[in-house]
From Swiss-Prot:
It comes from Bifidobacterium longum (strain NCC 2705). The lineage of its organism: Bacteria, Bacillati, Actinomycetota, Actinomycetes, Bifidobacteriales. CDD domains: TGS_ThrRS, ThrRS_anticodon, ThrRS_core. This is Threonine--tRNA ligase. Residues 255-561 are annotated as: Catalytic. It comes from the Bacteria. The keyword Nucleotide-binding applies.
């Protein structure tokens, strides 16, 4: 006889329910519940429950709920595409940050009008209130159903497809399943290979937008066919969608590539190649200010500065393991030093040299260059080291993803007893320095071992991971797990910073490493005279100078605080006869290492002021007849407010004070507050 009731836990409360109960019945009164979490796994709302299950609701406007709704939107989009283009072949349709995409193989690239047609068809499908229904299938059944879909067949036959993050939306390691789109009459009108979960019904997709299309290689490989990737976004409400679109508009205004060109900061000449930035004088001024302050703070925290070459013999990266684990991200080798006699016979074998992708192996050689004592530990080595990483040309993006980058790279060698305290002080140092650059809203991410890509023992990884987790929790910042996200040599904490418009950027990383000291046979003489392995900590505060520059440029929308601004003071004389007085004052600022310019152009004064305002300079100094007669200058700030007739000695001290304090000043009120403190 079938069991009449089962015992389950709902929202932490024990309940007895009928054995046929699903989430539909449990949460019938709350129409915002679109799925359930059963024993920690997201499942469809109508999934059968078993005795002993723990069940929690998933609301549409929650993080999990939005992901489920966006994935359902990919199915609606794919259905719409196949209705408009019946011969379209389906790829994968994963959820991404704030949206989703689906890959299609079609005869011609989609045009903007095509995307409008697809969006209209999606609206029709959503209004038709189709239900999503899951069914499990065997591999044989799946292959039969997808006989005319070559990309789906590839996923079905690939036993490791579930390890691919994009393909994992389609393929589960446990079983294969389809989702049928069922109309009101109970007819299956469309289907897709998918692991789920999905919405109960298309009508829950209340606010969506098709955004754009782009070419993309199938499964990210240049060896595979080119697909058309259609991007979209979906939100719980129309208000949320509108807010997202507003954020996109603001982000477009702040795009560092756009600002970089407008402000004459940097460029990417075709003659040099993709992902290789050239910083112009104004951009280099910002870089220098960033690096100078970083150097100052590292000296105060007892770091030893080192410098290493840009290329090295390949054997170094054999020792470190990079050639095994990271070769695809390295530039091809240069075979050098080979010598031949007159007959072409090799008399001296050459060696493969590589552009360095990372600084850590060279820092290990510095540690190893002589015997080390426990009295020297912790030893903190620091370098602004330029590294080179091969990114596909289609994947480079402004300064945030480049091929040549400079890291503020530190490697710290300490004892296991020092490890916890060193990590704690290091995280504090990192967060304080980021705050000095104007980033104040953080959370931490803990990246743990990828079981398919790591070196070292499980015990060592567990110790390293637990120590990092403990330090992260003691910071009182939010800690988010990143399963399988660590590099092959150790777990890491990354600092995620939210910018002025709420976007999240990964900035600093702190990585614990028990592995490389073993591979390099690093040792120190302990207090008892024994030889011991040091613990190694990798740390990049900026991540890379280029990326952090881009983050700051977008965070401030080009209006850097005075200490970072490429031009800190711009002088604008009301007329030519007042220029000498202004030039004398500007010279006194330049003697204090303030970055200044004067507008000597023939433009009218009004145009000069408009041009100066567009330049985002923190201090525009104006000199007219009254200013000259009173040995004064007048300030104009970014918001248009002014302070008139400030004596030159006072003005000089106030400008230097604001620069020294590293505060943001956009108005006369900001300025007065900064100099009054």
């Amino acid at each position: 006889m079938a069991q009449a009731t089962i015992s389950i836990t709902v929202n932490g409360e024990a309940k007895e329910v009928e054995a046929t109960t699903t989430g539909v019945e449990l949460f019938a009164e709350d129409k915002n519940i679109i799925a359930v979490k059963i024993n920690g796994e997201n499942r469809d709302l109508y999934t059968p429950l078993n005795d002993g299950d723990t069940v929690d609701p998933i609301a549409l406007d929650s993080e999990d709920g939005l992901a489920i709704m966006r994935h359902s939107a990919t199915h609606v989009m794919a259905q719409a595409v196949q209705e408009v283009y019946p011969n379209a072949k389906l790829g994968v349709g994963p959820v991404i940050k704030d949206g989703f995409y689906y890959d299609f193989q079609v005869d011609q690239p989609f045009t903007p009008n095509d995307l409008k047609d697809i969006e209209k068809r999606m609206q029709r499908i959503i209004k038709s209130s189709q239900s999503f229904r899951r069914r499990s299938v065997t591999e044989e059944e799946a292959l039969k159903e997808e006989a005319d879909q070559p990309f789906k067949i590839e996923l079905i036959e690939d036993k490791e497809a579930h390890l691919d993050p994009a393909a994992a939306t389609e393929i589960s390691e446990k079983e294969l399943s389809f989702y049928d789109n069922v109309d009101r009459d109970g007819n299956v009108v469309w289907k897709d290979l998918c692991r789920g979960p999905h919405l109960p019904n298309t009508r829950y997709i209340k606010a969506f937008k098709i955004e754009r299309s782009a070419a993309a290689y199938w499964r990210g490989s240049e060896k595979n066919p080119t697909m058309q990737r259609v991007y979209g976004t979906a939100w719980a409400t129309k208000e949320d969608l509108k807010a997202y679109q507003t954020r996109l508009e603001e982000a477009a205004k702040r795009d560092h590539r756009k600002l970089g060109a407008e402000m004459d900061l940097f460029s990417f000449p075709d003659e040099i190649g993709p992902g290789l930035a050239v910083f112009h004088p104004k951009g280099a001024a910002v870089i220098n200010a960033m690096e100078d302050y970083s150097r100052e703070m590292h000296r105060k925290h007892h770091y030893s500065f080192v410098q290493t070459p840009h290329i090295t013999k390949g054997g170094l990266y054999e020792t470190s393991g990079h050639l095994h684990w990271y070769k695809d991200g390295m530039y091809p080798p240069m075979h050098l030093d080979e010598e031949k006699d007159a007959d072409g016979n090799i008399t001296k074998p050459g060696a493969d040299y590589y552009l360095k992708p990372m600084n850590c192996p060279m820092h290990n050689l510095i540690f190893k260059s002589r015997q080390r004592s426990y009295r020297e530990l912790p030893l903190r080595l620091f370098e602004f080291g330029t590294v080179y990483r091969y990114e596909k040309s289609g994947e480079v993006h402004g300064l945030t993803r480049v091929r040549g980058l400079t890291q503020d790279d530190s490697h710290i060698y300490c004892t296991r007893e020092q490890m916890k305290d060193e990590l704690t002080s290091l995280l504090t140092f990192v967060l304080n320095l980021l705050k000095d650059f104007g980033l104040t809203d953080f959370y931490l991410e803990l990246s743990t071992k990828d079981p398919n890509k790591y070196v070292g023992s499980d015990e060592i990884w567990e110790e390293a991971t637990n120590t990092l987790a403990e330090v992260a929790k003691e910071s009182n910042l939010e800690l988010v797990d990143d399963p399988c996200g660590a590099a092959f040599y150790g777990p890491k904490i990354s600092v995620q910073a939210r910018d002025a418009i709420g976007r999240t950027w990964q900035v600093s990383t702190i990585q614990l490493d028990f592995n490389l000291p073993e591979r390099f046979q690093l040792e120190y003489i302990a207090k008892d005279g024994t030889h011991q392995r040091p613990v190694m900590i990798h740390r990049a505060l900026f991540g890379s100078i280029e990326r952090f520059f881009a983050v700051l440029l977008e965070h401030y929308a080009g209006a850097f605080p005075a200490w970072l601004a490429p031009v800190q003071v711009l002088g604008v004389p009301v007329a030519d006869e007042f220029a000498p007085h202004l030039a004398g004052f500007v010279k006194s600022l330049e003697d204090e290492m303030v970055r200044c310019e004067i507008d000597y152009s023939d433009d009218r004064f009004g145009k000069k002021i408009r041009n100066a305002s567009k330049s985002k300079v923190p201090f525009i100094l104006i000199v007219g007849e009254e200013d000259m007669n009173n040995n004064a200058v007048s300030f104009r700030f970014r918001d248009g407010s002014q302070l008139n007739g400030v004596p030159v000695d006072t003005a000089r001290e106030q400008i230097l004070t604001v620069i020294k304090k590293r505060v943001q000043v956009n108005s006369a009120d900001d300025f007065n507050a900064a100099v009054a403190e």
